[in-house]
Structures are given as structure tokens and as C-alpha cells.
Amino acid sequence: MPKSNDDDVAQSEAVPLLDLVKPSLPISFPIKALQDLKSRSYFDSFHFQFNRSTVPFRRNSDCLPNRPRVLVCHDMKGGYVDDKWVQGCENEAGFAIWHWYLMDIFVYFSHSLVTIPPPCWTNTAHRHGVKVLGTFITEWDEGKATCKEMLATKESAQMYAERLAELATALGFDGWLINIENDIDEEQIPNMKEFVSHLKKVLHLSTPGALVIWYDSVTVRGNLQWQDQLTELNKPFFDLCDGIFMNYTWKESYPNLSAEVAGDRKFDVYMGIDVFGRGSFGGGQWTVNAALDLLKRNNVSAAIFAPGWVYETAQPPNFHTAQNKWWSLVEKSWGIVQTYPQVLPFYSDFNQGFGYHVSLEGRQLSDSPWYNISCQSLQPLLEFNEDNKDIIQVTVDQEGKNVFDFSEQHLNNYYEYDSAREASFNGGGNIVFRGKLKGDAYFTTRLFKPHLQLSSSPITISYSVKSDETSNLGILLSFSSPSLETKSILVAPEDPIRRFDDMSLQCLTTSVQTVSEWTVHEASLVMDGHTLTEISAFCYRPENSTKSAEFVALLGHISVKDHVQNQQNPEILLPASSWVIEAHNVELVPGNSSSKILRVKLEWRQKDLEDSAFTRYNVYAENVKSTDLRPRKVLEKPKSETVLLGIAHVPAYYVAELVVESDVKAVRFMVQACGEDASLGKLDEALNLLVDLEGLSVNHD
């Protein structure tokens, strides 16, 4: 695989030189030396527990689908850039992917020996039903020496395979891409086969649905000789693992030839496509669909390498628009490969993992920029319509400009930059619907393609809207019956169907509740035996609206819950007394003349559970200036503002730089557990811990 010009710089920036055992802001990092893999030193690092993925793989089956698949290999500036900050960072312009419905497997790649995916990618990919692999790579002379040591004996090969399997299992990702890009002594090839075979065996035992994929590089003769197709020189490795990632300099006939050699396993052949276009069929970049179309015709799988090209080369007009445009090429060639959600509860606030503000139930908690891909919720399957201002534009917004500004200058900027700055209902995103709509017309657009098999238990649909009085927004649900008959139901605050001659469907009127400036709609229904197959937005005007006018509405969230499942859910919120919370590594260091800096690691757990069912926690801090310092007691009248510090996805959070003024006697930390359906308890009933500063000595390092 190619090494970009930015790799050396990126690697030096990615993992700072620090003592990985000493407490510090949690980071993700690779393992660079074989000895470190052997010694298991990763598990001794302060950062280990923060790097665990906690979101389970949310699909009905652990197996890959029996069809041509899409693998996406990350490769972005050498890896470990903004995504290395496990608790997030302040660069809202960091690289992100949100087109998960167009892929089956995501590989995190760098040129370090053992590339461990940052948990943000695994959390988000699993939420969308996508498997995540790390990368084991050896290259050049150093790689040859590494292989010589690793493959010295059969037992050594097995031991290193077990180390890799242990890492994947402990950290919650789904396997490895094995890339040996150097020569190997031919007499060690049997041990290389044992390494691959044993890795697959151990991984499959510990992680159902795990994958080991071989990269087309070294051959069974020990030569580094890229084949670009499945041949007798690389097939022996293919036979031992779950798939092969073919090098990307293949010719037009190679996909079909590879499919013939693979036989029944042709879907396990992933033909590489370099998005930068370095020797790839069709040239990659904006003509990537040429290669994708050919692979689809030949009924083999695709491996898209380095989609970060859009970001790294600053494709115009801006990253968000260019990213949507580029991935629309993939969709046109390959179609939608992921249908989600497949399990309940279903919830999305359209958060893309970055933004300019954070809101909670309509109330803005922060107006600071942020980046944390773990926070990405289920992404809508919006269709990309370039330069078409004659219809309502539908965009996911993370920026928050005033979308209700109808001045000509603002409208031009809105369409050019695809950004509206309105606070969100939850998180940092929403969907903006904006354009011209006649009074007697309606507009629909796809949001999600679920595959939810429903029972006799009622389901509740809720969604939040912010709009002016002339713009209405409903949710259109499409169902399939056991006999494959289709049925659609409109969930809306009123029944507009009688006004539209071309529509014949049932309307379910919602109950309405106002939360801040948002209107929350809710309705329940029973669709026993049916399958929910599509969720769409339905835009229309109130009755008696006749003229064409500007339509604008924000969709803040949408959720679908099962009544019975909700009552039996282990994530039913528990009182603070059901938890234990502790402070570790507490340290007070000098700040400026009138302040100090508090550093502390917070850890919590449910008393009766070994592993928490929660995958998200809001962490707050509150300065205490009173003399009431009784632990585990929330002040009825806080002496200062409660501040959101961040969001944790494991039951731990490291507070690295909390500035406390000289008159602050203690800091109360509060942790608010959040359910998968975004349910959460009251903050004043959350588990909490008081850290008394008066008994702490100031550490001057």
C-alpha cells in the first residue's frame, strides 16, 4: 500500500512522546515494536480502559451477507490524528465518515506494526452494523527482520497470533487485516500460514463473526510480488482466512479471473481501488465509479482505499458537500448495502460526530466547537442533489447558523456553504429542510431504510421539529406485510391527506409537547407481523395555504421504541444508590496567580453488574464554595453553574485541566447515564462524587 507524503509528519503528531503508564488525557495509539506486542505492555498503559469499544454490533446476524460487499480502508494522513483523542477534541473540522450504509467492513490503517482502531470508529461503525478491523503490517527491511523473529518457530507464530486476537477481543473490534509487504525466507512460509490460520481460529472462538483478511502482497514463495488478482501464489493464504484484499493495480480482466479462481468464495475477494488514483483502474477520485461498476458486473467485492482523499485534497466547495457528492458515486454504482435499524430501540439525532454546540432535550449546554466520532448517531440515508434549488434542500446540519433568516445574502450563503446555524434538540446536529413549496403541494424524502420486524407489542414513534407557522413536517412510515403487501402510515400533527388527490394512506395524529423552542410529536401503533422498511420525511403546508413560499423546518430527532422491550430493558435508569463512583489519580497543580488546576480520573460501576449496559455517560462538574461538603449529596441550590465536561463511552473519564479558582473549596462531579434510546435521568438524581480540595496539597511537579 502507498505511503502518503504526510505520513511522517502525521505519525510524529499523532502519538506524542509521553509515559503511557502515567495519567494523561486518554489517547489511542499503535504498537510499533514486536517486543511490545509480545510483552502485552499495551494492557499496562493508563489509556487501555479508555480504548475499549462499548457499542455492540447492531445487526441481526454476525455473519457477512452472501453478496458482493464493500470494504473501506481508512488511511487518512497516517492515522491517529484528531480521532486519537478518545474523549474528543475541539477541532470541529476533523475528518469524519457518515456514509456507513454504503459499506460492510471498515479497516483502520496506518504504517505502524499494529494499528489499533480508535474506539470512536468501532463504536460508530458497530452502531450502523459495520465490522471494524485493525491492521498488522510489516514493510521493507525492518519488516523482514520482524517476520524473521515472529516466524522463527511454529510456537512463536501462534503466540503472536494470540496476542493480536487478545487485543481485538479486549478492545471490542472485529479482527485484522494482515499486510506483509516484504520478502520472507521461503522456509518460514509454513509458519506464516500457521500464524494466519491460528489467528483466524482463536479470533473466531472469542469473537463470533470476527474476520481475518489477507492483503495481496507476499507470495507463498516468500517474494513480495503483488498479484492484483487471485492466483496460485496468493490463494493458499486466501484459503486460510476470511477474505483477500487485492492490490489496486489490477487490469480490466482480473476481477472476472479472480472470481473464477475463488469459486463459491468470490464474495470474499475484495478488489482494491485507490481513491487517490495511483495506478487504479478508472483513475479513482471523481471517476471511482468506473472501477466500482466493473466489480459489480463481475460479482466480486470492492475494497475502497483512502476515501480521505476528499478531505486531504480539500475538494471544493467544502468538505461536507464534497464528501456527500463523492459517496453518491459509490451509491449509484453499488447501491445501499446496509439497512438499519434492525433492532429496537431506534434513535437518531443526526449527530455526525462533530459540531459547534451541544444540546440536551432542546437546551443548549455548550457553544464550543467539538469533535468526537463516538457521539455519531445513526445516520440518515439522504439523497445527494447537486445544484438543484428548485426542490427542498435536505441537509444534515452541524453548524447552527440562523436557518430562519430569509435575506437574499443569507440564502445565497446557505446554498453555497450548506450550513445552517440553529441549535439542536440533542447533541450537535439536525436535518434542515429548506426550499420553495406551494400550498397545495407536498415533498417527501427518504431518511432511513430499516428492517424492523414488529410484534403485537405497540411501538411509539416520536420526533422533534422546529419550524415557522407555515411549514409542517410529518414522518411517513412504510411497512411490508408477511404476504409482501405494502402499507404506508403518515405520523403528523394533523391529517393533510384529504388535500392531496394523489395520496391514499392512513394518517396517525400525534400528541404534541413543547420543549424549549422545539415541538415534540408522539404517536403509538400496532403493526403485528409487519416489517418497517422505510422512514421518510413528509413536508407540507398548513390548510388554507395557497401561495408558494419559503419552507423551512428542522428535524431534531426521531425514535421508535417497543413498549414491552422498554419495560424489560436492562438500561432502565437506576438511582444513584445503585452505583459506585470513585476518584483516582487526584492531583492539584498550580495555575495562574489566583487559580489551580485539578486533574482526576473518575471511575464508576453498577453495584450488581460486572459490565454496565450503558454505552454513554454525560460528565458534569460543579464548583462548591459553601461549607456543606458532605459526600454524595447534591446541593439543592448550587453555588455555581453546572458545566458539561464531556461525554464518556466507558465507565471512566479523565479530567485533565479543570481550572478552579482560589475560593473553590470542592468540586462535585456528576455522571448521567444515557440509554441507547437517549433516555436519561434527572441530573440532580445522577451519581455524584465530591472531591474536597482543602485536603489536597498542590503538586509543583
From Swiss-Prot:
Disruption phenotype: No visible phenotype under normal growth conditions, but the double mutants engase85A and engase85B accumulate very high level of free N-glycans carrying two GlcNAc at the reducing end, but their counterparts with a single GlcNAc are completely absent. The keyword Cytoplasm applies. GO terms for biological process: N-glycan processing; protein deglycosylation. Optimum pH is 6.0-7.0. One of its GO terms (cellular component) is cytoplasm. GO terms for molecular function: mannosyl-glycoprotein endo-beta-N-acetylglucosaminidase activity. It holds the Pfam family Glyco_hydro_85. InterPro entries: ENGase (IPR032979), Glyco_hydro_85 (IPR005201), Glycoside_hydrolase_SF (IPR017853). It comes from the Eukaryota. Keywords: Cytoplasm, Glycosidase, Hydrolase. The keyword Cytoplasm applies. It is an enzyme of class 3 (hydrolase). Its EC number is 3.2.1.96. It is found in: Cytoplasm, Cytosol. CDD domains: GH85_ENGase (cd06547). It catalyses: an N(4)-(oligosaccharide-(1->3)-[oligosaccharide-(1->6)]-beta-D-Man-(1->4)-beta-D-GlcNAc-(1->4)-alpha-D-GlcNAc)-L-asparaginyl-[protein] + H2O = an oligosaccharide-(1->3)-[oligosaccharide-(1->6)]-beta-D-Man-(1->4)-D-GlcNAc + N(4)-(N-acetyl-beta-D-glucosaminyl)-L-asparaginyl-[protein]. Endoglycosidase that releases N-glycans from glycoproteins by cleaving the beta-1,4-glycosidic bond in the N,N'-diacetylchitobiose core. Involved in the production of high-mannose type N-glycans during plant development and fruit maturation. Belongs to the glycosyl hydrolase 85 family. This is Cytosolic endo-beta-N-acetylglucosaminidase 2. It comes from Arabidopsis thaliana.
